[in-house]
């Protein structure tokens, strides 16, 4: 849904790295190298960034009653 600010497992701040990670991967860079360059070393943080799917634009269409 929304970009996670912290890793769900360890609590490290990762929200500031997501958009740079996404942009570099979309340009064709290897995700492993990008995560290494950004300093994301823990596998739990890497998993959180790699598996995140942005659904907020699709969910915003529905109204809350």
From Swiss-Prot:
Primary subcellular site in the record, as a coarse category: cytoplasm
GO molecular function, one term: zinc ion binding
Record's catalysed reaction(s): RNA(n) + a ribonucleoside 5'-triphosphate = RNA(n+1) + diphosphate
Top-level taxonomic group: Archaea
CC per GO annotation: cytoplasm; DNA-directed RNA polymerase complex
Location within or outside the cell: Cytoplasm
Residues where Zn(2+) binds: 7, 10, 44-45
Cofactor note: Binds 1 zinc ion.
InterPro entries named in the record: RNA_pol_su_RPB10 (IPR023580), RNA_pol_suN_Zn-BS (IPR020789), RPABC5/Rpb10 (IPR000268)
Listed cofactors: Zn(2+)
A Pfam family assignment: RNA_pol_N
EC number: 2.7.7.6
Enzyme class: transferase
Keywords from the UniProt entry: Cytoplasm, DNA-directed RNA polymerase, Metal-binding, Nucleotidyltransferase, Transcription, Transferase, Zinc
GO biological process, alphabetically ordered: DNA-templated transcription
Known role: DNA-dependent RNA polymerase (RNAP) catalyzes the transcription of DNA into RNA using the four ribonucleoside triphosphates as substrates.
PANTHER family in UniProt: DNA-DIRECTED RNA POLYMERASES I, II, AND III SUBUNIT RPABC5 (PTHR23431:SF3), DNA-DIRECTED RNA POLYMERASES I, II, AND III SUBUNIT RPABC5 FAMILY MEMBER (PTHR23431)
Complexes and interactors: Part of the RNA polymerase complex.
Assigned protein family: Belongs to the archaeal Rpo10/eukaryotic RPB10 RNA polymerase subunit family.
Stated name of the protein: DNA-directed RNA polymerase subunit Rpo10
Organism: Thermococcus onnurineus (strain NA1)
Higher taxonomy: Archaea, Methanobacteriati, Methanobacteriota, Thermococci, Thermococcales
Encoding gene (name): rpo10
């Amino acid at each position: 849904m929304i970009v996670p600010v912290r890793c769900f497992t360890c609590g490290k701040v990762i929200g500031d790295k997501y958009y740079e990670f996404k942009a570099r991967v979309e340009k064709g860079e290897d995700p492993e190298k990008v995560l290494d360059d950004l300093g994301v070393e823990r596998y739990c943080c890497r998993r959180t960034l790699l598996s995140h799917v942005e659904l907020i634009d699709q969910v915003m269409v529905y109204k809350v009653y």
